[in-house]
């Protein structure tokens, strides 16, 4: 049965408009995104099948172009739409990090880093540049690597900090494996960066590692 044949108060779109998006299941939200089903399946049926095939909503949202498009009912247009929606979500979060915003909560840092770096398929090293009152000057993804690591050039980080007249930095990188445990190389890099920054009277406030769960703070783990 097509969704248009359902009672009005059971249709996902109408329920969203009446009661809010938070009241809908993952399958119902996905059905609104899909708009239509395929022969013999409503959009909700197709959405449930997709969630079952991918294993979770997150796995579906972070699927590669190829893995997404091989499923019946999907294709380039749906993949492009999904990527646009996800990017709008990231930019919405980024609006909190406009120049002049203060870092008033470690939770805000974790939320933004998780949303920005968690599901990347390659390792990314990013830097939050701050002024002497810990207000955000700029967030930049400075180095992009492979699934196993990213080469970080400390000289380039320091150069950019001086260009922005930064007084302090928070650095972060993701582990595509999802395991947010610091490696010996992570700790060594952090120590070398901290030492180099001290020579320029700059402060390294923290180094976060982003995995599947909450980003791990090396500062809270006892430093480096």
Swiss-Prot record:
Presence of the UniProt keyword Protease in the record: yes
Biological processes per GO annotation: proteolysis
Residue ranges annotated for the MPN domain, each copy included: 102-224
MF GO annotations: metal ion binding; metallopeptidase activity
Alphabetically ordered keywords of this record: Hydrolase, Metal-binding, Metalloprotease, Protease, Zinc
Positions contributing to Zn(2+) binding: 173, 175, 186
Source organism superkingdom: Bacteria
Signal peptide coordinates: none
Keyword Hydrolase: yes
Locus of motif JAMM motif: 173-186
Family label: Belongs to the UPF0758 family.
NCBIfam families associated with the record: PRK00024.1, radc
Name used for this protein in its record: UPF0758 protein AFE_0358
